[in-house]
Design a protein with these regions (language model features):
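C-terminal "post-core" interaction segments
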Residues: 1-209
Length: 209
Protein backbone atom coordinates (compact mmCIF):
# COMPACT_ATOMS: atom_id res chain seq x y z
CA UNK A 1 0.00 0.00 0.00
CA UNK A 2 1.62 3.31 -1.07
CA UNK A 3 0.13 5.38 1.71
CA UNK A 4 -2.92 7.37 2.76
CA UNK A 5 -4.24 9.70 5.42
CA UNK A 6 -2.74 9.80 8.90
CA UNK A 7 -6.11 9.77 10.66
CA UNK A 8 -7.26 6.75 8.66
CA UNK A 9 -4.08 4.84 9.53
CA UNK A 10 -4.66 5.63 13.21
CA UNK A 11 -8.27 4.42 12.91
CA UNK A 12 -7.21 1.11 11.34
CA UNK A 13 -4.55 0.46 13.99
CA UNK A 14 -7.00 1.43 16.74
CA UNK A 15 -9.32 -1.35 15.57
CA UNK A 16 -6.77 -3.96 16.70
CA UNK A 17 -5.34 -2.28 19.82
CA UNK A 18 -6.71 -1.97 23.30
CA UNK A 19 -4.98 1.24 24.33
CA UNK A 20 -1.57 2.90 24.24
CA UNK A 21 0.53 4.60 21.60
CA UNK A 22 -0.17 4.22 17.88
CA UNK A 23 2.10 6.92 16.45
CA UNK A 24 3.49 10.32 17.36
CA UNK A 25 4.79 13.18 15.26
CA UNK A 26 7.75 15.36 16.11
CA UNK A 27 8.98 18.57 14.50
CA UNK A 28 10.52 21.95 15.23
CA UNK A 29 7.23 23.77 15.73
CA UNK A 30 5.32 23.09 18.93
CA UNK A 31 2.09 22.38 17.02
CA UNK A 32 3.80 19.68 14.97
CA UNK A 33 4.31 17.55 18.08
CA UNK A 34 1.32 15.24 18.43
CA UNK A 35 0.55 11.91 20.06
CA UNK A 36 -2.05 9.46 18.75
CA UNK A 37 -3.22 6.79 21.18
CA UNK A 38 -5.62 3.90 20.78
CA UNK A 39 -9.01 4.24 22.40
CA UNK A 40 -9.92 1.87 25.21
CA UNK A 41 -11.46 -1.43 24.17
CA UNK A 42 -9.88 -3.69 21.57
CA UNK A 43 -12.42 -4.45 18.84
CA UNK A 44 -10.71 -7.56 17.45
CA UNK A 45 -9.43 -9.84 20.20
CA UNK A 46 -7.51 -13.12 20.33
CA UNK A 47 -6.85 -13.24 16.60
CA UNK A 48 -3.23 -13.65 15.44
CA UNK A 49 -2.27 -11.11 12.79
CA UNK A 50 0.37 -11.08 10.06
CA UNK A 51 1.13 -7.87 8.15
CA UNK A 52 2.70 -8.13 4.69
CA UNK A 53 4.97 -5.28 3.54
CA UNK A 54 7.41 -4.54 0.73
CA UNK A 55 9.27 -1.60 -0.77
CA UNK A 56 6.00 -0.08 -1.97
CA UNK A 57 4.50 0.03 1.53
CA UNK A 58 4.76 3.64 2.65
CA UNK A 59 3.41 6.31 4.95
CA UNK A 60 0.00 5.29 6.37
CA UNK A 61 0.60 1.58 5.81
CA UNK A 62 3.89 1.88 7.70
CA UNK A 63 2.06 3.54 10.60
CA UNK A 64 -0.30 0.57 10.88
CA UNK A 65 2.51 -1.99 10.55
CA UNK A 66 4.70 -0.23 13.12
CA UNK A 67 1.87 0.18 15.63
CA UNK A 68 0.76 -3.45 15.47
CA UNK A 69 4.34 -4.75 15.53
CA UNK A 70 5.66 -2.54 18.33
CA UNK A 71 2.62 -3.28 20.50
CA UNK A 72 3.15 -7.02 20.05
CA UNK A 73 -0.06 -7.41 18.10
CA UNK A 74 1.23 -8.64 14.73
CA UNK A 75 4.20 -10.14 12.94
CA UNK A 76 5.56 -8.41 9.84
CA UNK A 77 6.56 -10.47 6.80
CA UNK A 78 8.09 -9.46 3.46
CA UNK A 79 10.67 -6.87 2.44
CA UNK A 80 11.71 -3.65 4.16
CA UNK A 81 9.14 -0.94 3.57
CA UNK A 82 9.69 2.35 1.74
CA UNK A 83 10.46 4.52 4.77
CA UNK A 84 8.19 7.52 4.20
CA UNK A 85 7.85 8.91 7.68
CA UNK A 86 7.49 12.63 7.04
CA UNK A 87 4.38 14.75 7.54
CA UNK A 88 3.63 17.61 5.17
CA UNK A 89 1.52 20.70 5.66
CA UNK A 90 0.25 23.09 2.98
CA UNK A 91 0.89 26.82 3.36
CA UNK A 92 -1.33 29.15 1.33
CA UNK A 93 0.59 31.96 -0.38
CA UNK A 94 -0.70 35.53 -0.97
CA UNK A 95 -0.65 35.03 -4.75
CA UNK A 96 -2.97 32.03 -4.52
CA UNK A 97 -0.20 29.48 -4.75
CA UNK A 98 0.60 26.76 -2.26
CA UNK A 99 3.79 25.63 -0.58
CA UNK A 100 4.10 22.06 0.67
CA UNK A 101 6.35 22.04 3.72
CA UNK A 102 7.72 19.02 5.58
CA UNK A 103 6.28 19.65 9.01
CA UNK A 104 7.22 16.68 11.18
CA UNK A 105 8.54 13.14 11.28
CA UNK A 106 6.55 10.13 12.42
CA UNK A 107 7.81 8.24 15.45
CA UNK A 108 6.77 4.61 15.98
CA UNK A 109 5.63 3.39 19.43
CA UNK A 110 9.08 1.85 19.99
CA UNK A 111 10.56 5.33 19.55
CA UNK A 112 12.27 5.10 16.16
CA UNK A 113 11.86 7.47 13.22
CA UNK A 114 9.99 5.89 10.30
CA UNK A 115 11.70 8.20 7.81
CA UNK A 116 14.27 6.34 5.66
CA UNK A 117 14.43 3.30 7.98
CA UNK A 118 10.91 2.06 7.33
CA UNK A 119 9.64 -1.23 8.71
CA UNK A 120 12.05 -4.18 8.93
CA UNK A 121 10.06 -7.44 8.76
CA UNK A 122 10.48 -10.25 11.27
CA UNK A 123 10.54 -12.72 8.38
CA UNK A 124 12.40 -11.32 5.36
CA UNK A 125 11.59 -12.65 1.89
CA UNK A 126 13.90 -10.30 -0.03
CA UNK A 127 17.20 -11.50 1.44
CA UNK A 128 19.87 -11.96 -1.26
CA UNK A 129 20.82 -15.39 0.10
CA UNK A 130 18.83 -18.62 -0.22
CA UNK A 131 16.78 -18.06 2.91
CA UNK A 132 13.45 -17.72 1.06
CA UNK A 133 14.01 -20.77 -1.14
CA UNK A 134 14.88 -22.87 1.91
CA UNK A 135 11.82 -21.63 3.78
CA UNK A 136 9.43 -22.37 0.94
CA UNK A 137 10.89 -25.80 0.25
CA UNK A 138 10.44 -26.71 3.91
CA UNK A 139 6.93 -25.27 4.20
CA UNK A 140 5.73 -27.01 1.05
CA UNK A 141 7.32 -30.30 2.00
CA UNK A 142 8.89 -31.17 5.33
CA UNK A 143 6.92 -29.17 7.89
CA UNK A 144 9.20 -29.92 10.89
CA UNK A 145 12.13 -28.50 8.91
CA UNK A 146 10.08 -25.37 8.22
CA UNK A 147 9.98 -24.64 11.93
CA UNK A 148 13.75 -24.92 12.19
CA UNK A 149 14.34 -22.66 9.19
CA UNK A 150 11.83 -20.04 10.30
CA UNK A 151 13.38 -20.03 13.77
CA UNK A 152 16.78 -19.43 12.15
CA UNK A 153 15.31 -16.60 10.08
CA UNK A 154 13.89 -14.98 13.21
CA UNK A 155 17.23 -15.36 14.97
CA UNK A 156 19.07 -13.65 12.10
CA UNK A 157 16.65 -10.69 12.19
CA UNK A 158 16.87 -10.47 15.98
CA UNK A 159 20.67 -10.40 15.89
CA UNK A 160 20.78 -7.23 13.76
CA UNK A 161 17.66 -5.39 14.88
CA UNK A 162 19.77 -2.95 16.95
CA UNK A 163 21.28 -1.70 13.67
CA UNK A 164 18.41 -0.59 11.39
CA UNK A 165 20.74 0.36 8.53
CA UNK A 166 22.34 -3.09 8.52
CA UNK A 167 18.94 -4.74 8.89
CA UNK A 168 17.67 -2.81 5.87
CA UNK A 169 20.76 -3.82 3.88
CA UNK A 170 20.19 -7.49 4.75
CA UNK A 171 16.50 -7.20 3.89
CA UNK A 172 16.31 -4.78 0.93
CA UNK A 173 13.03 -3.02 0.06
CA UNK A 174 11.98 -5.11 -2.94
CA UNK A 175 8.96 -3.63 -4.71
CA UNK A 176 7.61 -6.79 -6.34
CA UNK A 177 4.78 -8.68 -4.66
CA UNK A 178 5.82 -12.19 -3.72
CA UNK A 179 3.35 -15.05 -3.79
CA UNK A 180 5.36 -16.74 -1.06
CA UNK A 181 4.59 -14.06 1.55
CA UNK A 182 0.95 -15.09 2.18
CA UNK A 183 2.03 -18.73 2.31
CA UNK A 184 4.62 -17.99 5.00
CA UNK A 185 2.08 -15.88 6.89
CA UNK A 186 -0.47 -18.70 6.83
CA UNK A 187 2.10 -21.18 8.13
CA UNK A 188 3.13 -18.92 11.01
CA UNK A 189 -0.46 -18.15 11.94
CA UNK A 190 -1.23 -21.86 12.10
CA UNK A 191 1.79 -22.68 14.30
CA UNK A 192 1.39 -20.96 17.65
CA UNK A 193 4.94 -21.49 18.97
CA UNK A 194 6.52 -19.95 15.87
CA UNK A 195 4.02 -17.10 15.88
CA UNK A 196 4.73 -16.38 19.54
CA UNK A 197 8.47 -16.30 18.90
CA UNK A 198 7.95 -14.01 15.92
CA UNK A 199 6.08 -11.58 18.16
CA UNK A 200 8.90 -11.70 20.71
CA UNK A 201 11.92 -11.57 18.40
CA UNK A 202 10.57 -9.68 15.42
CA UNK A 203 10.17 -6.32 17.10
CA UNK A 204 11.53 -2.91 16.29
CA UNK A 205 15.13 -1.81 16.17
CA UNK A 206 16.51 0.12 19.14
CA UNK A 207 14.80 3.48 19.22
CA UNK A 208 16.33 6.70 17.96
CA UNK A 209 15.07 9.21 20.46
Amino acid sequence: HPGGLLDQAVAVADFFLNDGRIISTKGRHQRSNQIFNASWGERVTDIPIAVLVNGRSASASEIVAAALRDRGRAIVIGASSFGKGSVQTIIRLPNGGELTLTWAHMIAPAGFNLQSHGIIPAICTSSPDNELADMMAAIRGDLPAAGTILNAALASRSAIRSNPDLARERCPPARAERTEDPEIAKYLLEHKSLYTRALRDGGAAIAER
